[in-house]
From Swiss-Prot:
Residues bound to Mg(2+): 173, 193
Example of a GO biological process term: ribosome biogenesis
Binding site for GTP: 166-173, 191-195, 213-216, 283-286, 314-316
Domain OBG-type G as annotated: residue spans: 160-333
Stored Pfam families: GTP1_OBG, MMR_HSR1
Organism: Salmonella gallinarum (strain 287/91 / NCTC 13346)
The protein's assembly and partners: Monomer.
Name of this chain's protein: GTPase Obg
């Protein structure tokens, strides 16, 4: 299946149903009074994370999602039916952004997590709500409020503990094949990897971590060269980055300059990402003598001003790979994911019915002083009106 990590969709919540103007009319009951019911609330639009999905390709074709409108109220104090909700399923790791405001509405990081992205409209009130000791035959009602409407950007960001970055043909895909069951394509030409891939590294029956491989970066990636830097977002949730450096590039390029290019593109993309823990890993040491490899790695590290630890491995022959993986595992155990902010309770929207009624009644009384016929709402073609006649 094609990997798609971005999609734009339109979500529209249902409008609230209108209230009804109706009067009870039965034999032998000449003054039955008002019996117009309230409308129903509009349906909501929800996002739900599903671990069985791994791409947003479905939303390249289906771009509009609309919840059901609440039904109008009816006579005999019948309340309109609430509109049905719409649930949009997305892969775990999806970020939801409101394109109108640029606000991040939420990150879907757990299976089954739900996020309200469009709230349905409130229902309108029937004329029964306006009955009082001084208004025995109210002919007023209110219409339902419109539901939310939003243009959303969905961004899929892979959930991994370890992220790999480097130039094309640095050996990233070979490494992930060596340490996990993932089988990304490996070949002797640049940009063999076209989409991100994940691999689970199992150290023993109880210890494991997830590593992410993304397409290689080249100079000018921030301006769109090569495959650009759009895949770097998949590393934002990683706890440590493995910067793979081809210790002896077959094209004769300078490993120091190659490393600086990666660091520069990383900083152009995000200072936060550039500040993440990053380990230097010199790959393909099987192509030269051990002593020569150690001396060359030391020279490269000094040229980069690198003061931390670095690793020498050969992903193809798995030389030094196991030690690196155990060090990664130890780092992950010693640096657990920071406790996310306390799970925010869904925002509770309290609709103050007493205040709402009071406000509506005040408006009705003000209108009644000017013209008793002003509140018939003749523009509402959907509302049901039954008027008691003598």
């Amino acid at each position: 299946m094609k990997f798609v990590d971005e999609a734009s969709i339109l979500v529209v919540a249902g409008d609230g149903g209108n209230g009804c103007v109706s009067f009870r009319r039965e034999k032998y009951i000449p003054k039955g009074g008002p019996d117009g019911g309230d409308g129903g609330d509009g349906g909501d639009v929800w996002m739900e994370a599903d671990e069985n999905l791994n791409t947003l390709i479905d939303y390249r074709f289906e771009k509009s999602f609309r919840a059901e409108r609440g039904q109008n109220g009816a006579s005999r104090d019948c309340t309109g039916k609430r509109g049905k909700d719409v649930t949009i399923k997305v892969p775990v790791g999806t970020r939801v952004i409101d394109q109108g405001t640029g606000e991040t509405m939420g990150d879907m990081t757990k299976h089954g997590q739900r996020l309200l992205v469009a709230k349905g409209g409130w229902h309108g009130l029937g004329n029964t709500r306006f009955k009082s000791s001084v208004n025995r035959t109210p002919r007023q009602k209110t219409n339902g409020t419109p539901g939310d409407k939003r243009d959303l950007l969905l961004e899929l960001m892979l959930l991994a503990d370890v992220g790999m970055l480097g130039m094309p043909n640095a050996g990233k895909s070979t490494f992930i094949r060596a340490v996990s069951a993932a089988k990304p394509k490996v070949a002797d030409y640049p940009f063999t990897t076209l989409v991100p891939s994940l691999g689970v590294v199992r150290m023993d029956s109880e210890k494991s971590f997830v590593v992410a491989d993304i397409p290689g970066l080249i100079e000018g990636a921030a301006e769109g060269a090569g495959l650009g830097i759009r895949f770097l977002k998949h590393l934002e949730r990683c706890r440590v980055l493995l910067h793979l450096i081809d210790i002896d590039p077959i094209d004769g390029s300078d490993p120091v300059e190659n490393a600086r290019i990666i660091i520069g593109e990383l900083e152009k993309y995000s200072q936060d990402l550039a500040a993440k823990p990053r380990w230097l890993v010199f790959n393909k040491i099987d192509l030269m003598d051990k002593t020569e490899a150690e001396e060359k790695a030391k020279a490269i590290a000094e040229a980069l001003g690198w003061e931390g630890k670095y690793y020498l491995i050969s992903a193809a022959s798995q030389l030094g790979v196991k030690d690196l993986c155990w060090d990664v595992m130890t780092f992950i155990i010693e640096n657990p994911i920071a406790q996310a902010e306390e799970a925010k309770q869904p925002e509770k929207v309290e609709f103050m019915w007493d205040d709402y009624h009071r406000q509506q009644l005040v408006e009705v009384e003000e209108d009644a002083d000017d013209d008793w016929d002003d509140d018939w709402d003749e523009d509402d073609e959907e509302g049901v009106e039954f008027i008691y006649k003598r």
